[in-house]
Each structure stands twice: as structure tokens, then as C-alpha cells.
Amino acid sequence: MPEGRAIRFGIIGCGGAAEPVCQAIAASPLAELVMLHDLNLDLARDLAERFHAPFTGALDQLLAHPTLDAVYVAVPHHQLAPLARKALEAGKHALVEKPLALTLVEADALIALAEAQRLALGVFYELRHTTAHRQARELVQAGAIGEVIGVRLQTLIDKPQSYWQSGWSGRWTNPWRGRKDEAGGGVVLMNTSHFLDAVRYITGLEVVDVSAEVGTLAANVEVEDTAAATLRFNNGALGSLFAGAHIPGARRGDEHFDIYGAQGQLRLPDPYGDDPLQVFLRRDWGGLPAGRWQALPGAPAPVYVEAIEAFARAVQQGQAPPTGGRDARQVLAIVLAIYQAAAEKRTIILSRSEATYA
């Protein structure tokens, strides 16, 4: 594919997740929106009118579009893998919403298919594109905080009960989020998975074993709304995780994570927003003074635009996307281990194919 030509996207699924992606495609010179698809024609028509693109209720019509290069797939979790497979089988690159699949078998099949077809398979873990996450990765990889010894993940959200019926946007009603067989999981899979991916990206570490408890304590749904877990990483570092979907009074900044090193620590105080990375170092490093907390300067990044453009460049250059199917598989393995550990009341050791720490 000629480098520099805009990648022509189709949208599969026109619910709440699709709107900011359509905005990002419209804002990028590297991307172009050519068609939208949803079985709910009202949803498809709404986005089509706003973003000046044709729409269809027939997936085959979208996949047969003569100029289509790639699709963005944003549908209920249980439909992600089947629809991504159809796109790949049709010869289209696929950028899929997390978690990509509900089982490792499904994820592995998609990865193998994409590689066999020489197609890009990306997953929309967009936090990698924030300024603070990039700064954190640079500091950790350069050794500024020394060896990573611990991670603390906190996901406190005050979701309305209506979330389980209509999501954040309220654009349509479908109770799939609260059904175990359709969602695959609750607050850990839907929310904390973003942090798990971010920690892998920043530290380069892998989770090797998990102990956990989960519960459904505040909502009338089949999936967890509360979870706590202990993680061990492949360098021996420890991690703690707490997630709650219905925490009264939870505010911006109550979703955050900290990375502790032998020579300093990092706090990402608002991973979804624009708050700067907070840094404490025991030693001077690269112009950063030791012994006090400081906020790193940096302009907020247009995260969705950068995620779309990173995928588009991968397609143009015939390279793997920066957040690919294997990344999503690793996160899914951690989440499934959390659920298994809670169900079986024991520590789950992830396989040696996914980690190196004995």
C-alpha cells in the first residue's frame, strides 16, 4: 500500500464507542471514513449524517466496498471476535475494540489469521498515546526510577445503574454489559484492562501469577462490579489492584495507577485526562531534581487521533500496529486469570509461554 495515502476505514458498530473514533478519522489526514455498518439503522444513520458517509445494515456490503482498506470494530464483546474474523477473511485490516475476544482460543485464532493474511490486527487500548504514558515509559525504560518493584492500580468509578443498559452515551439500549456470556466480565475487563495494558507498555513487565477476589455488590448484573487482586511480575515485582464500578462520590483522579521503583516512583493521576505525570526521584536525572514531587510538563495529546494514525501508519508501512493482537491477548490472559483465581480461591500461574519468571 502506498505510504502516505489515507487509509479508508469502515465502521462496524455505531454505538457510543464509535463516535469519538469517527471524529478522529475526520480529523486525521491519514484516515478517511468510507462507510458505516450497524444492524440498528437508526444508529448508523445518525453517525452517517454527522460524518457525511454512507451506511448499511448489511455487513457484506461494507466489506465489499471497493475502496475499503480497514475496519474499526466496536460491538458488544461477544461479537468482537466473530466480526473481526469476517473482516480479516475479507482481506481487510482490523482495528478492534478491547478486549478483542472473550477467550484465549478466539484471540489466538485471530492473531494467526491476521498473520497468515499479512493484515494488521490492532486493538484500541488508547492510553498508550497519552503524553503522560509516553513520558512514564521513557523514564522507566531509561532507568530513572531504577528497577520496578511494585505497581498499584486503582479503578474507582461511580457508574449510574443505567450504564448496564445503555452505556455511557445512552445512544441505545442493550443490556449486554451485565450478561456474563456476552460481556465476559465487568469492571476488570471493561475498565481496569486499560491500566493493565498501560503497565505492560510502560514497564515492559509481564504478570506471571495472580490471586484475586471479585464480587457483584452494588448492581443487579451477572458480572463483577468490585474486584481486588494481587499480581506478581516476571522480575519479581508485586502489584495490587482494586476496582469498583459503583463507588459513591468517585471523582476524576480516582482512576489512577502508581509505579514504584527502587530509585523513585511515578503517579499517573488521571490516565484518561490531561493531568501531568507526577514524579519523585531519589537521584537527579535528566534535569529532574531529586527529593521532591514534580509534575512533568507536556501538552495533552489528541489521543484518539494518534491511535488512529498509529494504526494507519502500520497499515501503510506493512508493519505490526503498536498495540496489536498479541498485546490484547496478554491483557486478556491476566483478566481471565483474575476471574479464575477468584472462582477457584487459589493463585493462578500464567503459562511460561506468557512469562519468564519462575
Predicted regions and their residues:
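Beta-loop-alpha module in the N-terminal Rossmann-like domain of NAD(P)-dependent dehydrogenases
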Residues: 21, 40, 53-113
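Predominantly a Rossmann-like dinucleotide-binding segment in NAD(P)-dependent oxidoreductases
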Residues: 128-220, 345
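Active-site loop of classical SDR/Rossmann-like NAD(P)-dependent oxidoreductases
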Residues: 39, 296-308
